[in-house]
Amino acid sequence: MMNTYDNQHREQQKLSENILKTKPLIAIVGPTAVGKTDISIKVAERLPVSTGIISADSMQVYKKMDIGTAKPSQEIRTKIPHYLVDNVEPDEEFSVGRYQKHAKSILNQLYQNKELPLLVGGTGLYVDALIYDFSMNELPKSTKYRQELQQKAEQDGLEQLYRKLEKVDPDAADRIHPNDQRRIIRALEVYYYTGEPISQRQKRRYDSPYNLLIFGITMDRNKLYNKIETRVDQMIDQGLVEEVKYLLENGYHLQLTSMQGLGYKEIAGYLMGDYDLETAVQKLKKNTKRFAKRQLSWFRRDPNIKWLDITETDKSEICDKIIDMILKEYLE
């Protein structure tokens, strides 16, 4: 009779053999604070083969920005390899195209090493760029028009550009933060150049070049909002104010894309004397809830996502379901 060890060894051997042949790609997505990180780590620890976690978070790529981006601890990242975390300085630009290029290279390396890739994050455009292999070259770049928009933002305020985006592409406006100047300008630029809303271009689905299995983690909205409030309070206790103060004192100004991220802009306003800390915290909670709503809107339109509701379900039970589906998908 074959024992448990023999079964596990067979699973490990077969899964390793299938990785290079079938190019599996597992993704765990969902709104901020829902528990993606914890679930992904538990799944990676329990899978019978070595697993590398690729971050699909547009903020975790920045160094020196740890608390506000809720990065996994260094201890966890030492135990389980994490990629595209702490890659660039806060004053460096990191585009979707650059993300896609790095992520594809990491994927290929994992396949060569017969390691299973686990994509985890809530930045929908990053997720889609990798799993559906969108061509970044098909989105035109009009430098002159971009400069005009940048000047307009400086002269009239970013709010004016955001209102324009709401008129020409309400779907994109719903998914882009009103403070995200780079993406607002990019969306307007694509519309100007092509006459087609960027949201429509992004809705086109291509067949994934990977053997894709994508899970969406969700929960009751009120419970999610409570978790967001708790997370923000924890970030303050962990030293978010000091983190933002350090960044500002070291020359990382508010015009940088990185400093427009949730937590950094709100706390910077407090540090610059625009309002008190309590107001900053309330702003951050409100903006994070709005962000979570936009994330859910983005992922809900993807028919490939297998949704798992953890409102009344223990995380370990969710992990069991994910692992069972992974083994069924890639072992048979």
From Swiss-Prot:
InterPro entries: Dimethylallyltransferase, IPT, P-loop_NTPase. It catalyses: adenosine(37) in tRNA + dimethylallyl diphosphate = N(6)-dimethylallyladenosine(37) in tRNA + diphosphate. The record marks 123, 146 as: Interaction with substrate tRNA. Residues 57-60 are annotated as: Interaction with substrate tRNA. Its EC number is 2.5.1.75. SUPFAM superfamilies: P-loop containing nucleoside triphosphate hydrolases. Pfam families: IPPT. The keyword Cell membrane does not apply. Keywords: ATP-binding, Magnesium, Nucleotide-binding, Transferase, tRNA processing. ATP binds at residues 30-37. One of its GO terms (molecular function) is ATP binding. GO terms for biological process: tRNA modification. Substrate binds at residues 32-37. PANTHER family: TRNA DIMETHYLALLYLTRANSFERASE. Catalyzes the transfer of a dimethylallyl group onto the adenine at position 37 in tRNAs that read codons beginning with uridine, leading to the formation of N6-(dimethylallyl)adenosine (i(6)A). Monomer. Belongs to the IPP transferase family. This is tRNA dimethylallyltransferase. It comes from Natranaerobius thermophilus (strain ATCC BAA-1301 / DSM 18059 / JW/NM-WN-LF). The lineage of its organism: Bacteria, Bacillati, Bacillota, Clostridia, Natranaerobiales.
